[in-house]
Design a protein with these regions (language model features):
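Bacterial N-terminal signal peptides
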Residues: 2-15
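Extracytoplasmic small-molecule ligand-binding "clamshell" domains
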Residues: 21-93
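Periplasmic-binding protein-like
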Residues: 38-39, 111-119, 188-232, 248-255
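Hydrophobic residues within well-ordered alpha-helices
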Residues: 62, 81-85, 131, 169-170, ...
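Short helix-initiation/N-cap motifs at beta->coil->alpha
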Residues: 69-82, 142, 157-171
Length: 255
């Protein structure tokens, strides 16, 4: 199973009760689209709202396309999703296996991401293939990167959050950090004096790259089609790219 940041993928989210699911007509009748998001997880989302996070901004744009407003449903753990009653989750892995038991329905993908290596500007590393028993890599606990590197006997240092791994990197405690390009890019934007070099995704490692989509909680066909069409419009007119760029993130096209 592919693992990424909390609330970035549906694999970490619990099922809502089927009775809580709403159709497109019900969403339009209520006037609001519910988005489950973490209240303190920039660049993804922030309840404080300064900045709001790209999930909130994209959620607002998507809701506008559907003719409604956005209602953020703030959750911290997977268990809260059962009672939150949200309609969508953003930045989920577009892979049924990765969704586990969430049963989230997946839109067409709108960008590609994964786990990349962040290194110091002076590092000679250029890919995962360059890692060996002499390079220590920061990984998230229980992540696919941790498992992949462990199988190769690459020394790792475990962290609970990507920001901690990046801080350890700039403090010369590790040689590289296995993180999402999203978080590394935002780190560079907010720490210009400590900017790291982000290596390209290694597509030769199939478990370390994936497409990203909108996760929908038991939608009807009308909602699925409406979300797909809305996201296609927002991608075509540059809205999606502009939103992520405000957080220092350059999107890659899905494959």
């Amino acid at each position: 199973m592919k693992i990424i940041l909390p609330l970035m993928i549906g694999a970490l989210l619990g099922l809502t009760d089927p009775a809580q699911a709403r159709t497109l007509d019900a969403i339009r009748e209520s006037g609001a689209l519910g988005l489950c998001a973490h209240p303190n997880a920039l660049p993804f989302a922030s309840k404080a709202g300064n900045p709001p996070g790209f999930q909130i901004e994209l959620g607002q744009a998507l809701a506008h396309e559907l003719g409604v407003s956005l209602r953020p449903d703030w959750i911290i753990t997977q268990y809260q999703m059962r009672s939150a009653g949200c309609d969508i989750v953003l930045d989920v892995i577009a892979d049924r296996e990765a969704q586990g038991e969430t049963n989230l329905k997946i839109s067409k993908p709108y960008y590609r991401t994964g786990v990349a290596l962040a290194v110091l500007p002076s590092s000679q590393l250029s890919s995962f293939k360059g890692l060996d028993e002499r390079t220590k890599v920061g990984v998230l606990v229980g992540s696919i990167a941790a498992m992949t590197l462990g199988q190769r006997h690459v020394p790792t240092s475990t962290f609970g959050f990507e920001i901690d791994s990046l801080e350890a990197l700039v403090n010369h405690e590790i040689d590289a950090a296995a993180v999402t390009p999203t978080m590394a890019s935002y780190f560079n934007q907010t720490h210009p004096d400590k900017a790291v070099r982000i290596l390209d995704l290694d597509e030769s490692e199939p478990n370390l790259s994936w497409n990203v989509a909108v996760g929908m909680v038991r939608p009807d066909d009308a909602l699925r089609n409406a979300v797909d069409q809305a996201m296609e419009r927002l991608s075509a007119d540059g809205t999606v790219e502009r939103i992520y760029h405000r957080y220092g993130v350059t999107l890659q096209k899905p494959k």
